[in-house]
């Protein structure tokens, strides 16, 4: 037998053993505990998104909501095509680039360095009244979320407008789940493949 044939037979035997060994190993799967943890993480995310601070700019209709009770915004304010309000009644007409000083009182319009706005008319991302499953699916749907993948959505969570939910100014309830816990839950859910309940 030539040396080349011998080497080929040894290599073939080695590959066969390797394939047989690999076939006996348990496949790597996301077990129920991983999925359960991801779904628990999403529930934390859901609680934040369905808090009034987030829902008020993510209603089902075109009128933003306001207040801790989520009532329809006064002055017949409307979303507008770009989410910044209608001509002559744009969000920034009343909402400045920062929360006003507390001495101004409890009912002064809040502000954000990013500029106040809602999602655009053709990319409504609705948080109000959505079931956990529907909310989860919609968040990941680029037709509704501004064309963002999970990494871009995570970046969005660091914008001044989103951060505002944890420091909404005098007379407004902040998001009840600490921001660090929310971000950790988002990241755990995303790492697990963002499963939906």
Feature-to-residue mapping (PLM):
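Electrostatic cytochrome c docking/interface patches
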Residues: 28-48, 64, 68-83
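C-type cytochrome heme-c attachment and multiheme electron-transfer modules
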Residues: 43, 52, 105-197
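Processing junctions and N-termini across compartments
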Residues: 48, 85-88, 130
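Short, solvent-exposed loop/turn and secondary-structure capping segments
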Residues: 59, 66-70, 103-107
């Amino acid at each position: 037998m030539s040396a080349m044939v011998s080497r080929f037979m040894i290599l073939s035997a080695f590959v066969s053993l390797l394939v047989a060994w690999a076939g006996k190993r348990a496949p790597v799967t996301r077990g129920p505990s991983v999925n359960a943890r991801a779904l628990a993480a999403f529930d934390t995310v859901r609680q934040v998104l369905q808090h009034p601070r987030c829902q008020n700019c993510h209603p089902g209709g075109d009128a933003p909501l306001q207040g801790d009770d989520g009532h329809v915004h006064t002055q017949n304010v409307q979303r507008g095509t770009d989410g910044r309000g209608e001509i002559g009644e744009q969000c920034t007409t009343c909402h400045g680039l920062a929360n006003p000083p507390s001495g101004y009182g409890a009912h002064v319009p809040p502000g954000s360095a990013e500029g106040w706005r809602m999602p655009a008319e053709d990319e409504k991302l609705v948080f109000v009244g959505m079931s956990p499953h529907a909310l989860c699916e919609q968040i990941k749907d680029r037709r509704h979320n501004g064309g963002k993948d999970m990494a871009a959505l995570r970046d969005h969570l660091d914008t001044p407008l989103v951060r505002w939910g944890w420091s909404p100014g005098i007379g407004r309830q902040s998001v009840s789940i600490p921001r660090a816990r929310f971000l950790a839950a988002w990241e755990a859910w995303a790492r697990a493949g963002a499963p939906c309940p």
